[in-house]
UniProtKB/Swiss-Prot annotation:
This is Ribosomal RNA small subunit methyltransferase G. The lineage of its organism: Bacteria, Bacillati, Actinomycetota, Actinomycetes, Mycobacteriales. GO terms for cellular component: cytosol. It is found in: Cytoplasm. Its main location: cytoplasm. It comes from the Bacteria. It comes from Corynebacterium glutamicum (strain R). Keywords: Cytoplasm, Methyltransferase, rRNA processing, S-adenosyl-L-methionine, Transferase. NCBIfam families: rsmG_gidB. Specifically methylates the N7 position of guanine in position 518 of 16S rRNA. Its EC number is 2.1.1.-. InterPro entries: rRNA_ssu_MeTfrase_G, SAM-dependent_MTases_sf. S-adenosyl-L-methionine binds at G82, L87, A133, E134, R151. Belongs to the methyltransferase superfamily. RNA methyltransferase RsmG family.
Length: 223
């Protein structure tokens, strides 16, 4: 089945699908390929993806987001804040159709795009909410979830104040972070505790599949 209702200009060059994609997305590989094509074309034209990122979409964006499912139990609820063009929420939803995922995005043009992708790829496990995670109306719509994810949204302390109120007591925020994560933990430890966060862990996922595994920070909500 081809998912052609996502706009993709004719004659566009697409990278060969890397072998790791089949391992990560399994039976939903075709959906992942369609999402890659959409980001490379429509996503780039609409300003969601920079032109220099297009050749690196698989490795730097889609695969490293898809593998975060390794850190999640079966059938849980997930909220992805500041979802943008759907990273990490869309790859996660494709890789883990058992998860119930809410994408939270404040900008209209991006939330419209997310709904287009959801419909085009038949992602029945995805809900899109336009708004900011810190807004009361959004918190009421989302309710409490098992895990809140994010990618390149904000410094760690601010991220904790936005994420943890959406998490059930005992649940976690799981954020994609870079090499400076330990420095962020040291700098923002007080703000994290104030937000109700504890049991901070840093680990990697995707070691067996990716040349550069994904670094995650996990913070449990205590109160």
């Amino acid at each position: 089945m081809l998912y052609r209702s996502i706009s993709c200009p004719k004659g566009t060059f697409f990278m060969t699908t890397p072998p790791a994609a089949a391992e990560i997305f399994g039976d939903n590989l075709e959906k992942a390929i369609a999402y890659h094509e959409s980001l490379a074309t429509d996503g780039s034209v609409r300003g969601f993806i920079g032109p220099r990122e297009v050749p690196r979409l698989w490795d730097r964006h889609i695969l490293n987001c898809g593998v975060i499912g390794e850190a999640m139990d079966e059938g849980i609820s997930v909220a992805d804040i500041g979802s943008g063009a759907g990273l990490p929420g869309i790859p996660l939803a494709i890789a883990r159709p058992d998860l119930n995922i809410t994408l939270i995005e404040p900008l209209l043009k991006r939330s419209v795009y997310l709904n287009e992708v959801k419909e085009a790829l038949n992602l029945d496990n995805v809900t899109v909410i336009r708004g900011r995670a810190e807004e009361k109306v959004v918190r009421k719509q989302v309710g409490l979830v098992d895990i809140v994810t994010s990618r390149a949204v904000a410094p760690l302390g601010k991220l904790a104040t936005w994420s943890l109120p959406l998490v059930k007591i005992g649940g976690r925020m799981v954020a994609m972070k870079g090499s400076s994560v330990e420095e962020e933990i040291e700098r923002d430890a007080k703000e994290i505790r104030k937000a109700g966060g504890t049991d901070i862990k840093v680990y990697t996922v995707g070691e067996a599949l990716l040349s550069e595994p994904t670094t995650l920070i996990s913070i449990r909500r205590e109160k």
